[in-house]
């Protein structure tokens, strides 16, 4: 068995990033209560397995396209058979759901996200108007999952909302960057429907994420150190989207997309600072 091919199928780096997000979300929600580490480890394993299921499922549904566009992927290159990929992907989700039973709320959310991943791969991947929102939801939901694992979702809901709107904005910007390829693949996206106006939609979503970012401070969950950190992040967000709005080129879109990804990680650090130095 080609282990490397299976790691490639599940996109190992993405799975590790998602599971780390759940762990960090739980740390933030528990204010670094180390008594909750066991729950956080279990939650991280669940997220890893369910994420792997979703990524493998994408390759299964994309087989026809990948034979042309990505022939070196594990299934079209025949390093993994289609049947083995199906068995493997569903084995991952079954294991993930079983482990999630350590907390009934975690189990219910794992079931929900597994269904969402199935629907995304089978139905909404070519309809990016809905697909972008799904990707943004899934990205942010790992933080809530970590919060559920430790029994406190108050702060992680705010982190989820900030991540959701920032990632939703980023997905639209990425589609603007890839508009020619999406036209060839007959994909439905906001940039295809709206053209350059889609940049204003992306800017609005990002500004809404910025608008939400002070809430943990205003509601008394975090102190001034969080506020200082997140204002710095907000300024970086604004700088990137400002440049794109006034120069809506593909190159600037690429820079803005990268900026949002980096700054979203900095926002996560701001939440960590807020949790540590309340």
Curated annotation (Swiss-Prot):
Source domain of life: Archaea
Q: Where found?
A: Cell membrane
Question: Is this entry keyworded Transmembrane?
Answer: yes
List all membrane-crossing ranges: 12-32, 34-54, 92-112, 129-149, 153-173, 204-224, 226-246, 257-277
A GO cellular component term found in this entry reads: plasma membrane
Q: Name one GO biological process term.
A: glycerophospholipid biosynthetic process
Tell me which UniProt keywords the record has, alphabetically.
Cell membrane, Lipid biosynthesis, Lipid metabolism, Magnesium, Membrane, Phospholipid biosynthesis, Phospholipid metabolism, Transferase, Transmembrane, Transmembrane helix
What Gene3D superfamilies does the entry give? UbiA prenyltransferase (1.20.120.1780)
Any GO molecular function: magnesium ion binding
Tell me which stretches of the chain form a coiled coil: none
What Enzyme Commission number does this protein have? 2.5.1.42
Catalytic activity line of the entry: sn-3-O-(geranylgeranyl)glycerol 1-phosphate + (2E,6E,10E)-geranylgeranyl diphosphate = 2,3-bis-O-(geranylgeranyl)-sn-glycerol 1-phosphate + diphosphate
Q: Which Pfam families match?
A: UbiA
Q: Which cofactor does it need?
A: Mg(2+)
Give the CDD domains listed for this entry.
Answer: PT_UbiA_DGGGPS
Question: What is known about what this protein does?
Answer: Prenyltransferase that catalyzes the transfer of the geranylgeranyl moiety of geranylgeranyl diphosphate (GGPP) to the C2 hydroxyl of (S)-3-O-geranylgeranylglyceryl phosphate (GGGP). This reaction is the second ether-bond-formation step in the biosynthesis of archaeal membrane lipids.
Show the PANTHER family listed in the entry. CHLOROPHYLL SYNTHASE (PTHR42723), CHLOROPHYLL SYNTHASE, CHLOROPLASTIC (PTHR42723:SF1)
Q: What is this protein called?
A: Digeranylgeranylglyceryl phosphate synthase
Provide the species name. Answer: Methanococcus maripaludis (strain DSM 14266 / JCM 13030 / NBRC 101832 / S2 / LL)
């Amino acid at each position: 068995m080609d282990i490397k091919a299976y790691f490639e199928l599940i996109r190992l780096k993405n799975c590790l990033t998602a599971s780390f997000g759940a762990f960090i979300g739980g740390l933030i929600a528990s204010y670094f209560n180390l008594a909750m580490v066991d729950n956080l480890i279990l939650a991280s394993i669940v997220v890893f397995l369910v994420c792997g299921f979703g990524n493998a499922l994408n390759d299964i549904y994309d087989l026809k396209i990948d034979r042309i566009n990505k022939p070196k992927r594990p299934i079209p290159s025949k390093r993994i058979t289609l049947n083995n990929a199906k068995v493997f992907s569903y084995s991952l989700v079954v294991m993930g759901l079983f482990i999630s039973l350590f907390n009934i709320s975690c189990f219910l959310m794992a079931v929900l996200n597994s269904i969402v991943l199935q629907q995304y791969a089978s139905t909404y991947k070519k309809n990016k108007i809905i697909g972008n929102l799904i990707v943004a939801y899934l990205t942010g939901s790992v933080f809530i999952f970590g919060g559920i694992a430790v029994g406190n979702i108050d702060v992680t809901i705010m982190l989820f909302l900030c991540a959701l709107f920032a990632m939703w904005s980023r997905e639209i910007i990425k589609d603007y960057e890839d508009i020619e390829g999406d036209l060839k693949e007959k994909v439905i996206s906001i940039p295809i429907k709206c053209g350059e106006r889609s940049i204003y939609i992306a800017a609005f979503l990002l500004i809404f994420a910025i608008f939400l970012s002070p809430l943990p401070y205003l509601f008394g969950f975090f102190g001034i150190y969080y506020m200082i950190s997140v204002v710095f992040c907000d300024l970086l967000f604004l700088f990137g989207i400002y440049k794109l709005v006034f120069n809506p080129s593909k190159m600037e879109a690429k820079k803005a997309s990268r900026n949002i990804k980096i700054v979203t990680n900095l926002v996560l650090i701001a939440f960590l600072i807020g949790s540590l130095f309340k």
